[in-house]
Amino acid sequence: MVKLHPGKEDLREGWMDSDNEMARRAGWSLTTERVINRPDGLDLDGLLTRLESSMSREVATVQWTMNYCLAEIGINFAEHRSRAIAIGEALGLFRDYPVSKGCTSPFAPIWIAEMVRRQS
């Protein structure tokens, strides 16, 4: 429902800095949606810096949505791909996440490489 709200950009920015874990998660979810669908004017370098500096300190539920954002930046923007992969490697989040046969790991470097491979 929020994704259709005309003021979602203000909500996105505010929620990313919220004290509430679920609001931060929603903020990162809206950010990922923007990365995928409307990246014009979005500071991708700034987002990568923020992900790199704060993702490891977040609670698991927020890390999951931040990781999704990191992966989508790496998948959709070749000029940011190596940095997104390097951040994923350095943080190591979801490196050992159990994955069913035939599924793609949520570990950002693996996820990015696989999605880029599928797109080519």
Placement of each model-derived feature along the sequence:
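Alpha-helical scaffold domains
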Residues: M1-S120
